[in-house]
């Protein structure tokens, strides 16, 4: 599942960059910029759907990766496991910032 995580992460970064090119964070124009992306940008609706569903797939792959690590006893490797926990917490914080704050 590690390679799927890499593919999901690259897809999220690329689609996020494409969406950020057309998004306006102003309180009055935010909704209209999302509507603009879906209606006027070539394949904007597809890019938006790939980005939203890719986030869910990314977290499913993370949970499968963690589950595989627990099943195989990788938590016994303290340093590796702690780095993974830190990366997981940073991913959760980034997802929270990207979902709640805009």
From Swiss-Prot:
GO terms for molecular function: metal ion binding; ubiquinol-cytochrome-c reductase activity. InterPro entries: Cyt_b/b6_N, Cytb/b6-like_sf, Di-haem_cyt_TM. It comes from the Eukaryota. It is found in: Mitochondrion inner membrane. Heme b b562 binds at residue 51. Belongs to the cytochrome b family. This is Cytochrome b. It comes from Plethodon yonahlossee (Yonahlossee salamander). The gene is mt-cyb.
